[in-house]
Amino acid sequence: MLFRSGQKKRENRQAVFLAETPFGHAEGSSLRIRLKHQSQHAQHQFGRVRLAVTSSGAYTEKEIPLKLEDWYSLGPFPTEGLSQNHGPEGAPIDLQQAFPSGGKVLKWAKETKYVDGQVHNLSIGDNTSLYLYRSIQSQSSRRVSLSLGSDDAIKVWLNQAQVMVNDVNRGVAADQDQAVLDLKPGANHLLMKVVNYGGASGFY
């Protein structure tokens, strides 16, 4: 992965290359970098170059954004309340897994219509639960804040650990709840459950 800064005229340029996998060992490592300069103007010069290797997480924390994978939904399930577990809670998420419910078999479905930062209607019916899942890819360990909204109740897990719960009856709006996510390097698994006690339903 490459991050670049310094795009203005007469401004120093900086490029940061992030390795996809860790490298290096106690006996030493050899790193080869090839640089090529191309310009349509003959007077352009490559300039001075300084190379350095670092294990600092400063760039990944400040400059490299998180990668948010697609949303998936599971349900709706007839429910007795927010505490009722319909299968995926507290366990590794398997998007191929099927869940029996009321004589039917429910499976995870990709939801390409969900856009972050917007309120989405779920239309799941009275006294039902719906699960929402996505993977969050992080280059490093970092803490982020998650803003949520729901109609009605909501519960959130990260990597199988519960991080937020609000058993409430309300209409959905932006920024009704906040959760803190302690992300680890690599894939992080975010699971949410929305319970509709009656009327409209949705999430933010």
Predicted segments with their positions:
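Beta-strand-rich ligand-recognition modules
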Residues: 13, 155-204
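Aromatic-lined ligand-binding clefts that engage carbohydrates, nucleic acids, or primary amines
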Residues: 138, 142-157, 190
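Exposed beta-strand and adjacent loop surfaces of beta-rich binding modules
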Residues: 30, 46-48, 143, 153-155, ...
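Accessory carbohydrate-binding/adhesion or oligomerization-edge regions at the termini
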Residues: 1, 46-48, 54-120, 135, ...
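Extracellular and analogous surface-interaction loops
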Residues: 17-27, 132-144, 180-185
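Extracellular beta-rich ligand/substrate-recognition surface
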Residues: 4-13, 120-130, 167-172
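Subset of Sec-pathway N-terminal targeting signals
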Residues: 1-62
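Extracellular beta-strand-rich recognition modules
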Residues: 31-36, 144-148, 188-194
